[in-house]
Design a protein with these regions (language model features):
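Short, well-ordered coil/turn segments that N-cap beta-strands
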Residues: 1-3, 43-46, 73-77, 97-98, ...
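Conserved, mostly hydrophobic/aromatic
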Residues: 8, 39, 47, 79, ...
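Conserved anion-binding
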Residues: 12-15, 19-23, 93, 97-172
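N-terminal beta-alpha supersecondary unit
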Residues: 13-60
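Short, acidic/polar
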Residues: 28-40, 84-90, 144-155, 206
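Glycine-rich, proline-tolerant flexible connector loops at the mouths of alpha/beta enzymes
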Residues: 46-64, 165-177
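Charged helix-capping and loop-helix junction motifs
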Residues: 60-67, 142-151, 176-184
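Catalytic cores of alpha/beta
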Residues: 70-73, 77-100, 181-212
Length: 212
């Protein structure tokens, strides 16, 4: 199991939101690059970035912060949030991120994602599944669908996806522990590599994930 620190970016700051609510924000740092370096120095082997401005508005406001992070760390960096066009993906991968996470695109622009999975590898394109009551949410969690999360993962596995970042929205930012049952079902039914996101706050949570 690999522990991946996450940095949520909003207006160039490191923040945390409660259940993705934009008005429930806590700012942790005004220097994302320094935060990334701190994580690497602590032993992180990979970083996960979320562009919240991109997720909420469809266009990012954190490109300078992302560039600075990439310049200052030597470990792989993956990013998600607002990546909804082929150009968005091309730009991020050209910047030097190791992988991009797509969610809304997989629902609304499946033809574009199919094309990208032929252009790049299944390790460079990661499927982001944001789940509320086991149904996929998109557009920065503002829009709900009737798509069941496991079926969604299986559909994209058939197109070449190898890895899923699974977020239980009800747990995100709450420090209440991950949804182990949902994560176990996702792993067992799909055979994909699963990144557990949302609610993880303690060594005990990590031990449970490792043993589940």
């Amino acid at each position: 199991m690999l522990l991946i620190p996450a940095i949520d970016l909003r207006n160039g700051l490191c923040v945390r939101l409660l259940q993705g609510e934009s008005d429930k924000e806590t700012v942790y740092s005004n220097d994302p690059a320094a935060m990334a370096v701190t994580f690497e120095e602590a032993g992180a082997k990979r970083l996960h970035l979320v562009d919240l401005d991109g997720a909420f508005q469809g266009e990012g406001a954190n490109i300078s912060s992302i560039r600075s992070i990439l310049k200052n760390v030597s470990i792989p960096v993956q990013i998600g949030g607002g990546l909804r066009t082929e150009e968005d993906i091309d730009i991020m991968l050209a910047l030097g991120v190791s992988a991009v996470i797509v969610g809304t695109m997989a629902v609304k622009h499946s033809d574009v994602l199919e094309k990208l999975l032929k252009k790049y590898t299944g390790e460079q394109i990661i499927l982001g599944i944001d789940s509320r009551n086991r149904k996929v949410s998109i557009e920065g969690w503002k829009e709900s669908t009737e798509i069941q999360d496991v079926k969604f993962a299986l559909r994209w596995k058939n197109s070449g996806i190898k890895r899923v970042v699974f977020t239980d929205i009800s747990r995100d930012g709450m420090l209440s522990g991950p949804n182990l049952a949902a994560l176990r079902e996702m792993a067992e039914h799909t055979g994909l590599k699963i990144v557990a996101s949302g609610g993880i706050s303690s060594i005990d949570d990590l031990e449970q994930l490792k043993n589940s």
